């Protein structure tokens, strides 16, 4: 075959535009991928370049277990505190409005804490936020221990409101970084079981803390021969030890792999940036916040007012008898949480919540309608009241925090969860403010009717929540990265 230089040059010239076009397309693809901010955090080689050790991951999960137990212990302190102050100060010295104010001080502090730490844990570090909140809980609880040394009574009660608010800021601030870190480590550990695992170290721990705290309270009463000031100092001293232990554990933990590769630490964040996030996640934010508000509106007041209701039903108003019934009542919701943890995978997060609200509705109306008879039969009342709480903890109690955590990408998980939780704590504060005067004006049964009615609304809202068990956390992170890049905010990598 004869070689023709001119033909060869012609073919080369013909191929040149094709090759140039291919090079151009490859360059454009590279630029596009860079611009869209793809992070190959799902790639094993990339993920292995930063991965917490097994010990660090285990410490994160263990500290979440203890922290949520501690937070449940803190919330449950309202029950014995109300009884002790009522006995020591009398009705005139401890009026219902001050009782409500003290209960709300922890809640108001929690609302501020959850919003502040939700933002900072996303923008800076989960670990730093968790250390800070543990310190605040320890300081606020230690100061609460000294409350009875403050005189006169009026000053003591206001001092107690303030220091419980400080502890509340720490308790509330604990929720966003703890929930975010916990779900991320659970996803790394065993993705299939992240839901049940999350419920076990959040709702189960907080719920288990209530009966254990009442057992500690009862032991202190017996050991001190019903010396209420000594009992008060003892239960608050024990509550101080827990956050100190958590602080020590958290010195050795680190941030998760997901958070390391997807965060806003170096991101430019003008107002438009936050509006874009709101635009993309507004429906999830609205539905999770509303569901949280409705559940906490009925659950929290019912939980902290239970000691007052039981104390009024105990004929001789014996403080130990009241405490024993409180232990039984506090233990009944625990099996509900365990069932709820199993149901999150078996039937899904949404249907578990709807089922729990349905049970809450039925029992709320049953207890309200039969309250005059139940008030004369303490065992029957406690069983039905405990079953009401068990169904609430099985459904929305087990799932609303889980859905709120899974519904948002890693980079804004703390903020999304914190806003939903803040609405929940607002609902708890509003409910607490409403329940006491409602009981005084319309009778104790009225609160159960209200709880049943709110549960109907909760079922409706739950229908519109995302089924978060179907969400892949890494895909959610990539989708957010693409969305921000397309709108002029490529994610800056660490």
Swiss-Prot record:
It comes from Aspergillus flavus (strain ATCC 200026 / FGSC A1120 / IAM 13836 / NRRL 3357 / JCM 12722 / SRRC 167). The keyword Amino-acid biosynthesis does not apply. Keywords: Cell membrane, Glycoprotein, Membrane, Transmembrane, Transmembrane helix, Transport. MFS-type transporter; part of the lna gene cluster that mediates the biosynthesis of diastereomeric piperazines. Lna and lnb clusters encode sets of enzymes that produce overlapping sets of previously undescribed metabolites such as piperazinomycin-like metabolites or morpholine. The lna and lnb biosynthetic pathways appear to be part of a signaling network that controls the formation of sclerotia, a resilient overwintering structure. May be involved in the secretion of the metabolites produced by the lna and lnb clusters. GO terms for molecular function: carboxylic acid transmembrane transporter activity. Its main location: membrane. The keyword Transmembrane helix applies. Residues 12-26 have a biased composition (Basic and acidic residues). It is a multi-pass membrane protein. GO terms for cellular component: plasma membrane. Belongs to the major facilitator superfamily. Sugar transporter (TC 2.A.1.1) family. It is found in: Cell membrane. InterPro entries: MFS_dom, MFS_sugar_transport-like, MFS_trans_sf. The chain crosses the membrane at residues 105-125, 128-148, 156-176, 203-223, 228-248, 290-310, 323-343, 354-374, 383-403, 446-466. PROSITE patterns: MFS (PS50850). It comes from the Eukaryota. This is MFS-type transporter lnaF. Residues 1-51 are annotated as: Disordered.
